[in-house]
Amino acid sequence: MAKRDYYEVLGVGKNASDDEIKKAYRKLAMKYHPDRNPDSKESEEKFKEVKEAYEMLSDAEKKAAYDQYGHAGVDPNMAGGFGGGQGYGGFAEAFGDIFGDIFGQQAGGGRRGGGGPQAYRGADLRYSMEISLEQAAHGHEAQIRVPHWDDCDHCHGNGAEPGSSVETCPTCHGAGQVRVSQGFFSMQQTCPKCHGSGKFIPKPCTKCHGQGKLKSQKTLEVKIPAGIDEGMRIRSSGNGEPGINGGPPGDLYVEVHIKAHPVFERDGDDLHCQMPISFATAALGGDLEVPTLNGKATFPVPEATQSGKTFRLRGKGIKGVRSGYPGDLYVHVNVETPVKLTEAQKDMLRQFDRSVHEGGSRHSPQEQSWLDKVKSFFS
């Protein structure tokens, strides 16, 4: 099945700003998050689709490639992976030479010097981390294990079986590029024999298969700043895939996702919570104690508080990761109807109800307003 357009997935236009893309992603991620839809396979698939779209459109380089070439511009299958014979340059390596010759520039961040093989920056790596709302609010330090490439201990990193040597590629003579004529056009392409390395290994290392490196894992310390929001990324420079032909390594991006909280719902730096209160407290008023991410807080509830009333507690939200200022906590109170009443309690409520209605409508203004609106239906 063909992939949907990434802009369509997020519900934004192709000219959407970074903030608009992030806002749309945050809204959809909260809607389809697996923690909120534990038994929905459809929601899980939509969450993955939304996450993939955001990963592409929030990265300036990937977004530019997608805008110009569509899904082909960001499809990792367009070039071989690390372990295969096609190298690991990705889309830029596959098309950089052709478009570079036509437009007079090198695409994809490659560099060439002295006619030798072209060097490419290593691919970036992504790591998804899930943390609690408390960890997001207060900051967090975590250890993660990520892919790492070490020099092969069998061939000491040169890719050749011990006792043999690495030779200059006989096809491109070490340049890593070959010139191909097609009609009136002459274009440079990556050498099909050495795949751009400029080298030829007659007897590849039996352990690393000529790559010179072995994939392993390493542990990194990640510092998550206080106030980080859903979908934000932390960059660890130089911890991506290794470069090709002497190019610099890529970066590691740690994408942070925040678990759904049983009490609070986050909106930027603000927090929202639903709080049930008794009928007596709503009618008579009183002080309420409410939880916050930094302990308990007390606020006054005035007399005659109606269900659905919202109270704002300034500075009780999350300290902004960029602004440094805390958001607010919004407490939405819901008047709870008592259940499992005894007969004596029911009699008391009936007496109370009669006494309230004997005084006219001044005790129930919303009820009277509603009756005034619908009385024509009963006449």
Swiss-Prot record:
Binds 2 Zn(2+) ions per monomer. Residues 356-379 are annotated as: Disordered. Zn(2+) 2 binds at residues 169, 172, 191, 194. A zinc finger (CR-type) spans 139-217. The keyword Zinc applies. Its main location: cytoplasm. This is Chaperone protein DnaJ. It comes from Cupriavidus pinatubonensis (strain JMP 134 / LMG 1197). The gene is dnaJ.
